From Swiss-Prot:
Keywords: Amino-acid transport, Cell membrane, Lipoprotein, Membrane, Palmitate, Signal, Transport. Involved in glutamine-transport system. Interacts with the glutamine-transport system GlnPQ. Disulfide bonds: none annotated. It comes from Geobacillus stearothermophilus. GO terms for molecular function: ligand-gated monoatomic ion channel activity. A lipid is attached at C27 (S-diacylglycerol cysteine). The gene is glnH. This is Glutamine-binding protein. It is found in: Cell membrane. Belongs to the bacterial solute-binding protein 3 family. GO terms for cellular component: extracellular region; outer membrane-bounded periplasmic space; plasma membrane. It is a lipid-anchor.
Amino acid sequence: MKRKTVWKIWITLALIALLSITALAGCSSESSTTNKEDGAKSTETSAGTNTLEKIKKRGKLIVGVKYDLNLFGLKNPETGKVEGFDIDIAKGLAKKILGDENKIELKEVTSKTRIPMLNNGEIDAIIGTMTITEERKKEVDFSDVYFMAGQSLLVKKDSKINSVKDLKKGMTVLTAKGSTSAQNIRKVAPEVNVLEFENYAEAFTALKAGQGDALTTDNALLWGMAKQDPNYRVLDETFSKEPYGIGSAKETKNYCKSLTNT
């Protein structure tokens, strides 16, 4: 990837990061805005308040993040620290709630494990490139969109694949388990083989080992992979919209608002 392109990505992420902390005040949950009993609303408010009080009493915010996605959440092998856009948002929330961005514990999640970890109480929130979908809203309450991505393909620089339409029967596309990417690619390219891995780091390693013709996920994540290895390129084409939101446990619909109003 050209250096100029990389800088454009970082500038864009930096600008969004400045806006995200305040933008979260509009936590989206369509079902909570209409036809609610006063008692139900009171219960949701209480649940959100109790969650916030629990975090303050504990003295740290526990957030589920990705460890394998350059630009968003990647563990630095030299320092052992996790770095990226999602990490900066998590630290911003910790500072807003507890007055110190360092009062935070980052737990590794994958697309497959993040919702179960949230719902069993291991983490307070998910900030891990999670697309807001109607299906996920049944299990998770979401903040407003903090980043809009689109699904694309990562291929070798000399690959003849320049569009999703170039994916033919017999080809193999790699992705991660539990992701919307796996669902989407099966819809737009039903004849290809889809191999799902535990995380995107494993999928990228498999691509470099020749186990597939392309890797698919959101373009923002693919840019990070291409930045790591210049032998690969991201297609300009996208074939979905992937709005990222912060996830919190169900029945704490006012939790996100509480976080930003602290």
